[in-house]
Curated annotation (Swiss-Prot):
Could be involved in insertion of integral membrane proteins into the membrane. GO terms for cellular component: plasma membrane. The keyword Cell membrane applies. Keywords: Cell inner membrane, Cell membrane, Membrane. It comes from Rickettsia canadensis (strain McKiel). This is Putative membrane protein insertion efficiency factor. The keyword Ribosomal protein does not apply. Its main location: membrane. InterPro entries: Membr_insert_effic_factor_YidD. It comes from the Bacteria. Belongs to the UPF0161 family. Pfam families: YidD. It is found in: Cell inner membrane.
Length: 88
């Protein structure tokens, strides 16, 4: 089921998101966060986390958090490798 969800998210990123414009108030974007959450936590928990994130990504949410590192921090704590994009 995770593979299907990831394919749907990728479809959204490549075909639907460009039509809507860059409206996400978070970094990483909600769709990227959903991909990371599903990969780390599995289908159900990852979808739940993505749903909670998407609810916050609208103009009426009373919050100013723009940068969210929760998923990436979890990857470091759990021992999963995190790609370092800085030159050595």
């Amino acid at each position: 089921m995770s593979k299907i969800l990831l394919l749907l998210i990728r479809f959204y990123q490549y075909f639907i998101s460009p039509l809507l414009g860059n409206n996400c108030r978070f970094h990483p974007t909600c769709s990227e966060y959903a991909k990371e959450s599903i990969t780390l936590y599995g289908s159900l928990k990852g979808l739940w986390r993505a749903f909670k994130r998407i609810i916050k990504c609208q103009p009426f949410y009373n919050g100013t958090v723009l940068y969210d590192t929760e998923v990436r921090c979890h990857a470091r704590k759990s021992g999963n490798p995190v790609k370092n994009k800085e030159p050595k």
